[in-house]
């Protein structure tokens, strides 16, 4: 009796461990319609209204690496506060990380398959919108870079070496592209800041020039009034 119970326990443990090792793939939907997962990389700019929040969803497998970069390029309105709050959540809704700054990055490994949520909140600005540039996505390392392939074909040593070199080059180019996008964020933000300072200096210089000209006209007017002597006649003489 005891050996049978022992064997049954081993079978149950094996089933549980195999179930845990499987990927948490989402449901494909009703019928034969496949689930739309979108692209793996995205970069674009978005305008968030005062006190507003914008959220995005990115699909990722549990063996990937997620990256998220943002840069507040400029403010549109009465306020000049460029700080925003960025958050990342798991497919189950749990908070992964929060970033509250003008620019920032959120990077993490994906431990479950599903749609990860990214949110940007402009809660500190009640009277100004912010333009934010985003760059986020997911990439995979190793043999699981292409999840559409069920199994890889066996190649000879020469083709394997070429494939490995190509994969490394592709991996390095991808990370160069990431750093280039982050540098482009900074460049665009600096351009908007330079343009804002240029307009500020021009308007301030124009205002100061008008004040100087107006003060000169007023001084000339009062000086003329000070030295202006009225014409006197025999009947109209100034009294002592």
UniProtKB/Swiss-Prot annotation:
The keyword Glycoprotein applies. Keywords: Endoplasmic reticulum, Glycoprotein, Membrane, Signal, Transmembrane, Transmembrane helix. Glycans are attached at residues 107, 156. Residues 224-240 are cytoplasmic. It is a single-pass type I membrane protein. InterPro entries: Emp24-like, GOLD_dom. Residues 22-200 are lumenal. Residues 1-21 form the signal peptide. PANTHER family: TRANSMEMBRANE EMP24 DOMAIN-CONTAINING PROTEIN (PTHR22811). This is Transmembrane emp24 domain-containing protein 6. It comes from Bos taurus (Bovine).
